Regions:
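Substrate-binding groove of N-acetylhexosamine-processing glycoside hydrolases
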Residues: 1-152
Length: 152
């Protein structure tokens, strides 16, 4: 049995703690900062409580905090991008990039983490490459979203 811990919004770390207490391996999928269909700023039915930016992920992701416990029962982390709420293929890149890069950093990098300012600068330096490759790079931070920006 492997437990997928995902309902952070409803029960915080309860499922994670119970799984570890009973010696079950866990995959962290907290529904805060890992659902990439959530936009950076409010849009359609996504209120401010269901938005997040690169900084939120990098500094506040409950799944990342769990992985950093270095408990051998914590197997890793997942993220999701649900398209059942009107998110079309055309909209996907702006939700994935650059936020997926923070999640990849948390999932795979084992060295000392950069502070957020330096990480953000590294992301901005790579933006042009992503755009040249045909990816639509969305705003990284809420403060970068220009008035009138459309998520669709």
């Amino acid at each position: 049995i492997v437990i997928q811990w995902w309902n952070y919004r409803g029960h915080k770390e309860l499922a994670l703690q119970n799984a570890i207490k009973h010696h079950y391996p866990v995959i962290c999928s907290s529904n805060y900062y890992t659902y990439l269909n959530f936009p950076v700023t409010p849009w359609r039915g996504y209120t401010n409580t269901r938005t997040f930016d690169l900084k939120d992920i990098y500094q506040n992701n409950p799944s990342d905090k769990a992985i950093n416990q270095k408990d051998p029962l914590i197997l890793g982390m997942t993220c999701a991008l649900w398209t059942d709420d009107g998110v079309t293929e055309r909209m996907i890149d702006r939700r994935l990039f650059p936020r997926i890069l923070a999640l990849a950093e948390q999932m795979w990098y084992q060295g000392e983490r950069l502070d957020f300012t330096r990480f953000h600068q590294n992301i901005l330096q790579r933006k042009e490459w992503f755009e040249q490759m045909g990816f639509e790079f969305g705003p990284a931070l809420k403060s970068e979203v220009k008035k009138g920006y459309q998520w669709d």
